[in-house]
Amino acid sequence: MSFRKVEKKPTEMGRNMTHEKSDSDSDNEGAPMTVGGYTEFVARSDSDWDEPVYSGKARSNYNLTGTAKGTGPINSFSRKHFPNY
């Protein structure tokens, strides 16, 4: 009886949690994933691109556009775009 009850509890809890998480996951993961993923991609691209082909031109242009202008508007736009979060 005890074993059966324990097995039934996690199954039901997991099922409920999964369903609830899925609903919130869509909205919750949407904002952070976009912001974090985009930020990481930009930073990585900047460092990676800055060394190989583009040395000075891309660095000045990309850095200014991606770092200064990107950090501000991206954060503001992300918040405005995701009013649910």
UniProtKB/Swiss-Prot annotation:
Expressed predominantly within leaves and cotyledons vasculatures. Mainly observed in fully expanded leaves, at the base of mature inflorescences, in senescing leaves and cauline leaves, and, to a lower extent, in hypocotyls and rosette leaves prior to flowering. Induction: Accumulates upon light induced oxidative stress and after hydrogen peroxide H(2)O(2) treatment. Induced by drought. Negatively influenced by QQS. Reduced levels in response to cytokinin (CK) and methyl jasmonate (MeJA), but increased levels in response to ethylene (ET). Residues 58-77 have a biased composition (Polar residues). Residues 1-24 have a biased composition (Basic and acidic residues). Disulfide bonds: none annotated. It comes from the Eukaryota. GO terms for biological process: leaf senescence; regulation of starch metabolic process; response to cytokinin; response to ethylene; response to hydrogen peroxide; response to jasmonic acid; response to oxidative stress; response to wounding. Disruption phenotype: Reduced accumulation of starch content. Signal peptide: none annotated. Residues 1-35, 55-85 are annotated as: Disordered. Plays a role in carbon allocation, including during senescence and stresses, thus impacting starch accumulation. This is Senescence-associated and QQS-related protein. It comes from Arabidopsis thaliana. The lineage of its organism: Eukaryota, Viridiplantae, Streptophyta, Embryophyta, Tracheophyta.
